[in-house]
Amino acid sequence: MHFISEQRLDDGVLEREFTLGEIPGILWTPVSAPASAPVPLILLGHPPLGLRRMYPRLVARALDSAADGFATATIELPGSGDRPRWPVVEQARSDLRRAMEAGDPVNDEIVDALILPLAVPEWQAALDALLLLPEIGGPVGYSGGVISIGIRLAVVEPRICAAVLFAGSFVPRAMFEQARQVTIPLHVLLQWDDEGNDRQAALDLFDAFGSEEKSLHAHLGGHTGVPQFAGDAAARFFTRHLM
């Protein structure tokens, strides 16, 4: 991991951009996180729209988490931002736009091509490097979308002990079986009127999770209308399980 820039944000948070091989990422840590008192880490998931486009939303989440005593980090997803384009993913995005513009159902082939290439091993490699930093000590949580990444990480990554998942992205059928293997505590957010989300599929996915502790928090409104108090509840969830 190589840090390529550093700045101190107004809220007393240190923001550092890094590269891990060809993977760009950003790490936010509270200034009050010295090596003598390492803090828990939350991995910030996001849709494959590019870190620059997602930055305002990501940094807002990072600042809130820092105020609660957490470090946060995120990486650029394959085929997005400045990373090389993947033809299969680009074709899936075009097929998705055509289907939605025509009001047609989004078939399984499009969903699989769009979601399955998003590389969970890259998140694990980032986690390996982040946990070597003296100011980060774990435990580790995952927060956000794409929900399929959160599911897969919860299954294969034992260092993640709690997750806040956003039920607002397409889910390959294979993920429903994997959801049954998830056993960590879950806090799931669902926007009830999300125009791009299959509400029933989101409810079925929640039902499939194997966790003994799981809660579903549904709110009226579209995809970007998550109320502030929903974030407050998610923060309390992480404080219970990571502190």
Regions found by a protein language model. Give the residues of each.
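Serine-hydrolase catalytic machinery in alpha/beta-hydrolase-like enzymes
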Residues: I42-L132
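Catalytic active-site module of serine/aspartate enzymes centered on a nucleophile-bearing elbow/loop
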Residues: L220-G221, V226-M243
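N-terminal cap/lid segment of alpha/beta-hydrolase-fold proteins
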Residues: M1-P40
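Catalytic histidine neighborhood in serine/cysteine hydrolases
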Residues: A202-L203, D207-G225
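Conserved alpha/beta-hydrolase "acid-adjacent" motif
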Residues: A174, E195-A201
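Short beta-strand/loop motif that positions the catalytic acidic residue
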Residues: V182, V188-L190
